Amino acid sequence: MRSPYKKSKAAYICVWCLVLLLIVFIWLRNKSAFLPSVISTLIAILLGFFTSRLLENIISNTETTKRLGYLHMEMDPEKFISSYIDIPKKTTGDKEKMISYAYLSSGYEAAGDFDRALETLEKGNINGSDSLDTLYLSQKCRCLIEKGILDEAEDVLKELEKRIDSITGNQSLKDNQRQVQYVLSEMLRAKKGDSVDVEYLEGRLKATQYRIGRLEIYYTIAMHYRNKENKKKEMETLSIIREEGGNTWFRKWAEERLDEI
């Protein structure tokens, strides 16, 4: 995989420039020793290859993490989108490209642009791997629920459940995706006007690392209380969403709902 980030490419080029200088130095120093020069050159090339790839990957991961922080920590989807929108097109490799499109899709989803989130998600190619298939299906289901296309969301949720059941040899992934699937099923139930397992969802709040994920759960709980016509609890939950929602659609939705009550 070649990194889509300019800093990574610059580091890659710098490493190989140093390697070329080292090779020139080796041959100038050992003009009369052909075999040692060849061996030293091969070692320098191998060293350059592994060093450049390692440095490129480190910088690429750092840049991706920084940009995802705009979304998951700063709760600013527009800032994330503007910094990441060109990355998927520059990414090589089907797996990496699918992941990058899923990241961008989550940015559009957090901004409330569900059509673009779904459109962006479909640009990636799932390749039958457990992690990519479940990533694609869970993100698609989430967008469909939030957009209000509930029948299709239910079909995708069933497909996700079957795909999770088929996972073998990676119990950690299976358990994690099972939790994701259950939260989505509760969101779908709340969206349909049914009751949800609030106790379970409140437990998931404590275990959810990212703030976007917490908003998703609060959103489900708020809809549950709305369905139950428990205005006091609903307003308490909406107030939390308004306070923690940053620049996401969750906050705007909570503000509009609070104005209605």
Can you say where each PLM-predicted feature lies in the sequence?
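Solenoid-like repeat scaffolds
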Residues: 51-57, 85-96, 122-131, 158-174, ...
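N-terminal topogenic membrane-targeting module
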Residues: 48-127
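Helix-turn-helix repeat elements of alpha-solenoid scaffolds
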Residues: 36-42, 69-85, 106-121, 149-162, ...
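TPR repeat positional signature
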Residues: 63-67, 84, 101, 137, ...
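N-terminal alpha-helical membrane-insertion module
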Residues: 1-77
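Residue-level signature for tetratricopeptide repeat
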Residues: 69-73, 90, 107, 143, ...
